[in-house]
Amino acid sequence: MIRTIFTLIAFAVTNLFAQELPRLAAEQLKDEGLKSLGAFKLLQELTSIGPRLSGSAGYEKAVVWGKKKLLDAGCDSVWLQTVLVPHWVRGNVERASVHFGKKNEPLSICALGGSIATPKKGLRAEVIEVSSFEEVHQLGDKARGKIIFFNRPFDVTNVAVGEAYGGAVNQRGNGAIEAAKEGAIAVLVRSMTNAVDDVPHTGMMRYNESVPKIPAAAISTIGANKLSDLLKKEKNVTVEISLECKILPDVQSYNVIGELRGIEKPDEIVLIGAHLDSWDKGTGAHDDGAGVAQCIEAVKLLKQLNLKLTRTVRVVLFANEENGLRGAKAYAERDENKIERHIAAIESDYGGFQPRGFSVKTDSASFEKVKIFSDILSISAADQIRIGGGGADVNELAKFGTVCFELNPDSQRYFDYHHSSNDTIDKVHPRELELGAISLAILSLAIAQNGI
């Protein structure tokens, strides 16, 4: 009887210890992170490399840097995965002006990623403003030979700025296709931002091989407002555009991967990821240098605690998220995925602002299990867990039944900087950035030890 009592006490203490250890460890992760602010130091190094567009020398330097930093963080193994990526070059000429009466004024533009060039002498044509694809198609022959100006702004009443972006971004992505169907010779697209300034925001656009390819450029919000006003007041308004961008052959590049190996279930993977590439405007501090720095810092913090992880925590720094998702697709197609099981994949690709929580892409049964992590995530003030999307890169793993998460920071300022020359490290707060890294570390630890 006494032996039975001692056995029950020992079991209870062991069970309590198993429950308390993650919280105690999470407190330590928070304390160590906020003392060192290591994520910001990593971000300083990464952004000093400069822009990191796929196929560029900057990206290749970032690969070397990322591999070294994962080794320095104490990963048990670090390796590169080969990926074939697109190679688009912006060129040195991005120029536009609006002409009305005997006057002309400059417009602040930049080529959209993937656009073809204009003729060397540029092109000039009348402009027609629209706010939807339906309006383009209603123009019919009136669009032929014209520049179509997409000017649908974000819905400023939407508190979730990412949703407002989602409601406007099809103009950028598919505007050139839809305008070309009606015979347009170029498109201008209002920059994807709420900020009212003279800084254009780039981003990926697409072509359809069955539709003529036409040049595509983003125009700053101030420029868009100016052009819209002129079209209302003046007659025969034309715009002249010059771009010299090029689409070059695909090149070999890499995903950068490192991991802390699990002891009991090493083939069960908890992935934390971000994309290493950035657009060539600014230095990609928030998009997605912040996520890269947070992922490396998260495994560094976990390693410093010298924990025996039940499952493997793996960092993947993805190639080519911005203009193709080639890195994520290549990772999802690995032969090793037949042996390994990714039970969770957590992405940081929404800037380095104050974390609020995580959105989760999963079924309702798994979501109920995931909600229990909100308590431990309150340590880093990231305890708002909701059904939503995972990140663009990790969503490629959803087909395997992986529960996909995305870190959700405060979103109000993200699109002020997104894909623009404003995306630089002076816009990043060291403590906010670190709290994101701590949140990744806490959630990955909780899942590694408890599963889903």
Model-derived features: positions:
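Active-site-adjacent substrate-binding region
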Residues: 180, 186, 190-191, 209, ...
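Acidic/histidine-rich catalytic neighborhood of metal-dependent amide-processing enzymes
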Residues: 195, 252-255, 278-370, 452
